Amino acid sequence: SVRHALKAEKIGCDAASVDGFECGGHPGEDDIPNMILLPRAFEELKIPFIASGGMGNGQQLVAALAMGAEGVNMGTRFIATKEAPVHQNVKEALVNASELDTELIMRPLRNTERVLKNDAVTKILEKEKSLGYDIQIQDIFGEVAGVYPKIMQEGAMDAGAWSCGMVAGLIHDIPTCKELIERVVSEAEEIIASR
């Protein structure tokens, strides 16, 4: 959020990462997408910032630059690269996902997380629906605590909830990091040159 970025600036950070609602992981509780959040950050901040959340191609890099960011953070996108130290099942899940395949969990706990839909996420959402705001972290502990090694290292895709951004809908391949960066920069340069 802008207020978190301003706090980072106030305590002396040299730069900030501004995360839109599209991001994988914890987007905060304000639900502000990058098309609003980035220009607001540009209005308020004196320090440079990078755009995070929903970033994965040259179009998005150009858009982020136009809205005042100095660059982009592509968390979910870099998971689907050859060098990413995760199981091939995780990479393939991202390639096969659409922008509609994420869910928000832990809202009643005010610790909202965007994750890829799977069996564990369905269980969490059912518990949230039945327990409402009486839910406690202990109620979903089995689906969220300590699950990353099973998913990321062993490829057990339904072992628990795992962070994934909406940008999954734009992930169509598993390039090397070098190929991905060169592609994003090339796309961005082409867009800027042709406008």
Question: Positions of the model-derived regions?
Answer:
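Short, ordered loop/turn segments at secondary-structure junctions
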Residues: S1, F21-E22, R77
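Conserved alpha/beta-domain cores
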Residues: R3-I11
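Conserved active-site-proximal phosphate/metal-binding subdomains
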Residues: K10, G28-I50, G56-R195
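Non-cysteine beta-strand/loop elements that form the S-adenosyl-L-methionine
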Residues: D14-G20
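Glycine/charged-rich beta-loop-alpha catalytic/anionic-binding loops adjacent to active sites
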Residues: G20-C23, K46-I47
